[in-house]
Amino acid sequence: MKITSGDLPGVGKKISFITSEGSMVVLVIHHTGKREMYFFDDADDDEVSFSLTLSAEETKQMGAQLLGAILNPADTDKIDRIKLIRKQVVVEWIDITKHSPIISKSIAQIEKMKPKGISIVGVFKNDEMMVDPEPTLVLEKGDTLMAVGKRDAIQKFEELCACKENN
């Protein structure tokens, strides 16, 4: 499956999935939490075959099913614990811009710079998602980091990665 991702200014993010059979699903994630899914029979089609709008909660439920999770009423304690964790832990996609101070730095170098309470779990580079990136991987303009951590640590890390054009 080929996956591409990009920003939609003022809207949110767009992620396109092209299957091995050549069909395509486009997911638009709005800043409001709303998700829109557009299904194309062929990746080259301009006309949508089918579309679907989901709330953030509906998306979570669908995602759990796609991951093969089976929810039983007896699992409510686990679900409550997961909800508590989700309030404390954030998954963030951080775009590396041309003025970012972490361009040309390896994952190992960034690991030493990042605040405590955050993990870099993936890098989206050249239209490929690299899960658990190698320490020697060097970041370039246009790469996107996937980071997981506590909200305050994520915010500090975003500030570290942000462009500092005025310096």
Swiss-Prot record:
GO terms for molecular function: monoatomic cation transmembrane transporter activity. It is a peripheral membrane protein. Residues 79-163 form the RCK C-terminal domain. Gene3D superfamilies: Regulator of K+ conductance, C-terminal domain. Keywords: Cell membrane, Membrane. It comes from the Bacteria. It holds the Pfam family TrkA_C. The keyword Membrane applies. It is found in: Cell membrane. One of its GO terms (biological process) is potassium ion transport. Its main location: membrane. Modulates the activity of the ammonium/proton antiporter AmhT. Interacts with AmhT. This is Ammonium/H(+) antiporter subunit AmhM. The gene is amhM.
